Swiss-Prot record:
GO terms for molecular function: DNA binding; structural constituent of chromatin. Transmembrane segments: none annotated. This is DNA-binding protein HU-like. One of its GO terms (biological process) is chromosome condensation. Pfam families: Bac_DNA_binding (PF00216).
């Protein structure tokens, strides 16, 4: 499983020119922006990674709806 801290460590290892705090701030900024975009019902498209969007789902045996995040991966994600 990839956690936020794992991601920060890997990016920091790859980019030695940035401090770990700078990498953490950058990752936090990106994740906050993605989170806010989904809250505003915006579709997020990251080429060669996938699309994120909000879908409405109906509760079973109820007339109420809820929002859920939908992910669609690209066809070439696992191709070499």
């Amino acid at each position: 499983m990839i956690t936020k801290n794992y991601l920060i460590d890997k990016i920091h290892d790859k980019l030695n020119c940035l401090s770990k705090e700078d990498v953490k701030d950058s990752v936090d900024l990106i994740l906050d922006y993605l989170n806010e975009s989904l809250k505003k019902q915006k579709r997020i498209e990251i080429r060669n990674f996938g699309n994120f969007s909000i879908r409405k789902r109906k509760f079973p045996e109820s007339e109420k709806f809820y929002n859920t995040v939908y992910y669609r991966m690209p066809k070439n994600l696992f191709k070499e």
